[in-house]
Every structure is written in structure tokens, then in C-alpha cells.
């Protein structure tokens, strides 16, 4: 698709375009009433009304001329032109596949499981799911925030903002040129494969939301495209645009071969992986490893005898080379910070939730630190927000705490990637400094003798006041006093009580 920009006078035609899109979704919803189409996730019967409602909210918010949404290149107007054009095209494809109500000669090939038409409908449902997620991320409750969207991985966020500014969407050709200046890719089939992986909505453009999902899936940043090439191009276990039900169907052929597995980007938790595998007793299971690099998960699964045969094949690719490049980010603690925490009878590296273990993981994108055990327990309680600030947890990063006196060249070469530019290798990562302020401290863990209290992590955290040095007292001019045995005779003296 060519680069789409908001045409002159688009602001007057935008309400009509949004109205047409809502009516299109309503017509498709009428065609999806057959119970044989009620499958998922994702399910068109659920997605169509939710997308229509979100578009109504967008239209309402955009009608308020006082909002002042960014309307420059790649802003709110450009995004809506691209989005609505793509929505109309995908809507027509869905309409051609779905049976029309009241017509007995309608297409019946869409109902049988495994048919070509059913597979096309499942892929379109995935695209509609991605489009709804993208619109929700850039227009939460209908209000545009694409210019403020924060990419989860720090280095990826820096790359986008330095090269794209406040734009939320770019034509593929322009984005390809920018990315290749940082991560070179040969033109041809590999570039086409990269485009199909990045462009989740199949619009011919790349949004900041799609780039966020891609960098979360194929982290870490220094080896981003190496990871993608090994996992999405060369690995036989990778499956693109596959749903939960289709994974179950595909693995049925390997039920007599425990250890067979395939993996796909999750359609319910974008930015995370879903792995389907055949267990030792022949049952088919699917799991979503929360906020962990797929490389580490597959290696551990191979070691444990769970992920052995990708798509039933005997050869399991070796991922150890890429895992060796995944180094812990080193958080540097200055002398000032050490003194600040000592004044609170604590230490910077101590986890402020359990007060037992040291911090070894950072929540992304908010950046709060805690120990991995507390984070695992917190997420096990089905909470996907930070226990400190309640921001959504989109990722995690292993870290180690380095005090100021421990600086050395060896530490400098094993630091993380948040401050380096895209041309540096992993061994050249720089230390990242931390703002000299104490994080908010949640309450301590209750004693284990009271298992009924399972909500200890949901209590609202309180913030300790930032400690400041004592204010200096003003200097007072010295006064010569006459020393006598009778203090009452001094001028200005008061009577003793």
C-alpha cells in the first residue's frame, strides 16, 4: 500500500469515514450470527462490536476541536486514513467469505474445520484482533495518545523517537530504510518475511504499536534481527497467524511423539509467546511464558525434555549461541544513593516487597525493581500491573546491582543495553545510572502462618518522603555580654521562671 496521508479537507470527511466503518462492522456482525462460526479466540462475533464501539468513541473524541491532537505527518489523522482504508479492505474480504443471511446458496465451505475458506477466515479474525488492539493502544477510550506511546524496550523506544519523532505510523519503505541503518537486512525474500512479521495488520505500514510487539517478541535489541531470523525464519517450530484451536489440530498428528511442540505469537497477549506441546502422557497443552525471552524458555524446555521435536521433526535447532549474548543489565548505585538508603535503615539492592532477597529484575516499561520471586508470585495472582505504580507489565529484564566502588572495566563490558546506540555490540553496553530517589515501598509480606491473607500484594503502596539535608541556620551576630554575678542587670535579660 502506498504511503497514505490525510488529504486536504480530511477533517471534514473523517466523521463520515468513521460512520461508514461502523456501519460496515455492523453488517459483518449480522453475517456472523451462525453458531458454527462461534470459535476463538479470536472470535469475529466478539471483535466486530468492540471495534465498532471504539470507533464511535474515536469519532466522539475527534469531534471535540479543543483537544488539539497532533495532525502532522504520521499523526492521528494520517493513522486514521490508513486504518479505515485497511479496515474497509479487510471487511470486504470477510464479507465474501461469510454466508449472507437468508441466502440458501451461500458459501458453505467456510464451516468445515480445516477447509481453505475456514483458514482464511481465521487469519482475517487474527488481523481484526490486531487492529482492535492497535486502535485501543493508540486511541484508549477514543483519545489519541500515539505521540506519547512508550515502547516497552528502552533501546527500541529510543530508536523510534530519535528517528520517527512523535509520529505513530510510517510507510513500510521508510521504516525499512531506518531499521536497516541499525540492523542490516538483505533485500529479497528475507525482507519480505520481515515485513510479514512486523506488519501485524497487513496495512503496508508499521505503527509504533506493531514495532513494540515485534521488539518484545524478538528481544534483546542488540541481536534483534538475528533472533528473529533464527526463531521466525529458520526454526521449524514457528507458526505465524495460528490460533489456539489450530495449534490443537496441528499437534494431533504428534500425540504419539511426546516432546513435539510449536510456538506462535499469542493472539490474546500480544508481545508474548504461546507454546503448544505434547506432554509425556500424550495430551496437548498450551502455555504462555510470562515476560521471558523465548530463547531462554525453549532452552530450558529442551533441557527438561519438554520441547524436543519442533513440529514433530527430530532436529531441534541450537539456540545457545544467542542466549550467550543475553547479558544482565547492570544498575549502578552511586555513593549518594547508598547514603540515602542507609539513612532509611535499608539498602538499594534489597527487594522492598519481601525485604529478604536482592532485586534482580526490572519491570518494563515503568522500570521498577524487585526480586524475581516476588514478581513471579505477584503475576501468579493474575495481576499484570506493577505492584508499585500499577502500570501494565509488558516485559521484564534481568538486572544486577553494582555499587559505585565496584566499578571496573569488566563490569562496564557486561552492562545492559538501555543506554547504547544500535551500532554497539552486546559486549560494549554501558552502565545505566539510576535517579537518586527512593522508590515507593509496598508493605512487607505477612507471616506464612496466615495463608488466608492472599491479598498482601494488592495493598496500596505508600511513599516514603525523600530525605533532605538539614537546612542551615542563619548566622547571628555575636553580642558582647558583661559577665556579672547578677544576671538581672543585663540589658534585655528576662526573669527566670
Swiss-Prot record:
Notes on activation and inhibition: Phosphorylation at Tyr-341 is necessary and sufficient for the activation of E3 activity.
Enzyme Commission identifier(s): 2.3.2.27
Residue span of region Interaction with RET: 351-497
GO process terms (BP): cell surface receptor signaling pathway; negative regulation of epidermal growth factor receptor signaling pathway; negative regulation of MAPK cascade; negative regulation of neuron apoptotic process; protein catabolic process; protein stabilization; protein ubiquitination; response to glial cell derived neurotrophic factor
Zinc finger (RING-type): 351-390
Name of one Pfam family that matches: Cbl_N
UniProt keyword list: Calcium, Metal-binding, Phosphoprotein, SH3-binding, Transferase, Ubl conjugation, Ubl conjugation pathway, Zinc, Zinc-finger
Any one Gene Ontology molecular-function term assigned to this protein's record: receptor tyrosine kinase binding
Residues binding Ca(2+): 199, 201, 210
Region feature EF-hand-like, mapped onto this chain: 146-218
Entries under InterPro entries matching the protein: Adaptor_Cbl (IPR024162), Adaptor_Cbl_EF_hand-like (IPR014741), Adaptor_Cbl_N_dom_sf (IPR036537), Adaptor_Cbl_N_hlx (IPR003153), Adaptor_Cbl_SH2-like (IPR014742), Cbl_PTB (IPR024159), EF-hand-dom_pair (IPR011992), SH2_dom_sf (IPR036860)
SMART domains given in the database record: RING (SM00184)
Ribosomal protein is among the record's keywords: no
Residues where 4-O-phospho-L-tyrosine binds: 264
Region Linker: start-end pairs: 322-350
Record's catalysed reaction(s): S-ubiquitinyl-[E2 ubiquitin-conjugating enzyme]-L-cysteine + [acceptor protein]-L-lysine = [E2 ubiquitin-conjugating enzyme]-L-cysteine + N(6)-ubiquitinyl-[acceptor protein]-L-lysine
Residue(s) carrying Phosphotyrosine: 341
GO CC annotations, alphabetized: membrane raft; plasma membrane
CDD domains the UniProt entry points to: RING-HC_Cbl-c, SH2_Cbl-b_TKB
Domain notes: EF-hand-like and Sh2-like domains are required for N-terminal inhibition of E3 activity.
Known partners and oligomeric status: Interacts with Ubiquitin-conjugating enzyme E2 UBE2D2 and UBE2D3. Interacts with EGFR (tyrosine phosphorylated). Interacts with the SH3 domain proteins LYN and CRK. Interacts (via RING-type zinc finger) with TGFB1I1 (via LIM zinc-binding domain 2); the interaction is direct and enhances the E3 activity. Interacts directly with RET (inactive) and CD2AP; dissociates from RET upon RET activation by GDNF which also increases the interaction with CD2AP suggesting dissociation as CBLC:CD2AP complex. Interacts with SRC; the interaction is enhanced when SRC is phosphorylated at 'Tyr-419'.
Primary role: Acts as an E3 ubiquitin-protein ligase, which accepts ubiquitin from specific E2 ubiquitin-conjugating enzymes, and then transfers it to substrates promoting their degradation by the proteasome. Functionally coupled with the E2 ubiquitin-protein ligases UB2D1, UB2D2 and UB2D3. Regulator of EGFR mediated signal transduction; upon EGF activation, ubiquitinates EGFR. Inhibits EGF stimulated MAPK1 activation. Promotes ubiquitination of SRC phosphorylated at 'Tyr-419', has the highest ubiquitin ligase activity among CBL family proteins.
Protein name, as recorded: E3 ubiquitin-protein ligase CBL-C
Naturally occurring in which organism (per UniProt): Rattus norvegicus (Rat)
Annotated gene: Cblc
Amino acid at each position: 500500500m502506498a504511503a497514505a496521508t490525510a488529504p486536504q479537507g480530511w477533517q471534514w470527511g473523517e466523521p463520515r469515514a468513521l460512520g461508514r466503518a461502523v456501519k460496515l462492522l455492523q453488517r459483518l456482525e449480522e453475517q456472523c450470527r451462525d453458531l458454527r462460526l462461534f470459535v476463538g479466540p479470536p472470535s469475529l462475533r466478539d471483535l466486530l462490536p468492540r471495534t465498532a464501539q471504539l470507533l464511535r468513541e474515536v469519532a466522539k473524541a475527534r469531534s471535540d476541536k479543543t483537544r488539539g491532537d497532533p495532525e502532522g505527518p504520521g499523526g492521528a489523522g494520517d493513522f486514521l486514513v490508513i486504518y479505515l482504508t485497511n479496515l474497509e479492505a479487510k471487511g470486504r474480504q470477510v464479507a465474501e467469505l461469510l454466508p449472507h443471511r437468508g441466502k440458501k446458496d451461500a458459501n458453505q465451505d467456510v464451516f468445515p474445520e480445516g477447509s481453505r475458506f475456514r483458514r482464511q477466515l481465521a487469519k482475517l479474525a487474527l488481523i481484526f484482533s490486531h487492529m482492535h488492539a492497535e486502535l485501543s493502544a493508540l486511541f484508549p477510550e477514543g483519545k489519541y495518545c500515539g505521540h506519547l506511546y512508550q515502547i516497552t524496550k528502552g533501546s527500541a523506544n529510543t530508536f523510534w523517537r530519535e528517528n520517527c519523532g512523535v509520529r505513530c505510523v510510517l510507510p513500510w519503505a521508510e521504516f525499512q530504510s531506518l531499521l536497516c541503518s541499525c540492523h542490516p537486512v538483505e533485500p529479497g525474500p528475507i525482507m519480505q518475511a520481515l515485513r510479514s512479521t512486523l506488519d501485524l495488520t497487513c496495512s503496508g505500514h508499521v505503527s509504533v504499536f506493531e514495532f513494540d510487539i515485534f521488539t518484545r517478541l524478538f528481544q534483546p535489541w542488540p541481536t534483534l534481527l538475528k533472533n528473529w531470523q533464527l526463531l521466525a525464519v529458520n526454526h521449524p517450530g514457528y507458526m505465524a497467524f495460528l490460533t489456539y484451536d489450530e495449534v490443537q489440530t496441528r499437534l494431533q498428528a504428534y500425540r504419539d511423539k511426546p516432546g513435539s511442540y510449536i510456538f506462535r505469537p499469542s493472539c490474546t497477549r500480544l508481545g508474548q509467546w504461546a507454546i503448544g506441546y505434547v506432554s509425556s502422557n500424550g495430551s496437548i497443552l498450551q502455555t504462555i511464558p510470562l515476560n521471558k525471552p523465548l530463547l531462554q524458555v525453549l532452552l530450558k524446555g529442551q533441557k527438561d525434555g519438554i520441547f524436543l521435536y519442533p513440529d514433530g521433526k527430530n532436529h531441534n535447532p541450537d539456540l545457545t549461541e544467542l542466549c550467550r549474548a543475553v547479558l544482565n543489565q547492570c544498575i549502578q548505585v552511586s555513593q549518594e544513593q547508598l547514603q540515602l538508603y542507609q539513612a532509611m535503615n535499608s539498602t538499594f539492592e534489597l527487594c522492598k516487597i519481601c525485604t529478604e532477597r536482592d532485586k534482580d529484575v526490572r519491570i518494563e516499561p515503568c522500570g521498577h525493581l524487585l526480586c524475581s520471586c516476588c514478581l513471579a508470585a505477584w503475576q501468579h495472582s493474575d495481576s499484570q500491573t506493577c505492584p508499585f505504580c500499577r502500570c501494565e507489565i509488558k516485559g521484564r529484564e534481568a538486572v544486577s546491582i553494582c555499587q559505585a566502588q565496584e566499578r571496573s572495566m569488566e563490569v562496564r563490558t557486561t552492562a545492559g543495553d538501555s543506554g547504547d546506540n544500535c551500532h554497539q555490540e552486546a559486549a560494549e553496553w554501558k552502565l545505566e545510572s539510576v535517579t537518586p530517589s527512593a522508590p515507593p515501598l509496598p508493605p512487607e509480606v505477612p507471616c506464612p502462618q496466615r495463608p488466608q491473607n492472599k491479598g498482601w500484594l494488592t495493598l496500596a503502596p505508600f511513599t516514603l518522603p525523600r530525605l533532605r539535608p538539614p537546612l542551615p541556620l542563619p548566622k547571628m551576630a555575636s553580642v558582647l555580654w558583661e559577665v556579672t554575678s547578677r544576671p538581672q542587670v543585663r540589658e534585655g535579660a528576662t526573669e527566670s521562671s
